[in-house]
Curated annotation (Swiss-Prot):
Part of the Tol-Pal system, which plays a role in outer membrane invagination during cell division and is important for maintaining outer membrane integrity. The gene is pal. GO terms for biological process: cell division. The lineage of its organism: Bacteria, Pseudomonadati, Pseudomonadota, Gammaproteobacteria, Pseudomonadales. Residues 56-168 form the OmpA-like domain. Residues 1-21 form the signal peptide. Transmembrane segments: none annotated. Keywords: Cell cycle, Cell division, Cell outer membrane, Lipoprotein, Membrane, Palmitate, Signal. It is found in: Cell outer membrane. GO terms for cellular component: cell outer membrane. A lipid is attached at C22 (N-palmitoyl cysteine). This is Peptidoglycan-associated lipoprotein.
């Protein structure tokens, strides 16, 4: 139920960001509203690049530290890449180390899920390294299905558990 509410919230936030970004207001020569056309409380990529470099957009993306995956997949979603771009910018040259924790849903064997969690963490690692982050700053851990955030036995719960968490 929470994931459905989050999905509705994210869709509403995206619609609001697009509407604000496309509306014209007199008196603001920049073409941006008071908040740069971005809902700072929005989830994944609410602005989708309409106001690149906006501080509020970067702050919203920086707050995203959990990246979700489709069933039996380790492919990064575009919204995850946008958030990871901001994290990469922060990590480059900082020397700060982070842990990438790979997780899966409960389906499948323990061994399979440990490997899938590792593939997911490695996908995030590869992306960050391609953005210029030193591999020495990134530690990988796979928990497989051992640390679920949702304990239900349905698609909504499984979707919440298919993730990589970036821990500073």
């Amino acid at each position: 139920m929470e994931m459905l509410k989050f999905g509705k919230f994210a869709a509403l936030a995206l619609a609001m960001a697009v509407a604000v970004g496309c509306s014209s207001k007199g008196g603001d020569a920049s073409g941006e509203g008071a908040n740069g056309g971005v809902d700072p409380n929005a989830g994944y990529g609410a602005n989708s690049g309409a106001v690149d470099g906006s501080l509020s957009d970067e702050a919203a993306l920086r707050a995203i530290t959990t990246f979700y995956f489709e069933y039996d997949s380790s492919d990064l979603k575009p919204e995850a890449m946008r958030a990871l771009d901001v994290h990469a910018k922060d990590l480059k040259g900082s020397g700060q180390r982070v842990v990438l924790e790979g997780h899966t849903d409960e389906r499948g064997t323990r061994e399979y899920n440990m490997a899938l969690g590792e593939r997911r963490a490695k996908a995030v690692q590869r992306y960050l390294v391609l953005q210029g982050v030193s591999p020495a700053q990134l530690e990988l851990v796979s928990y497989g299905k051992e640390r679920p955030v949702a304990t239900g036995h349905d698609e909504q719960s499984w979707a919440q558990n298919r993730r990589v968490e970036l821990k500073k």
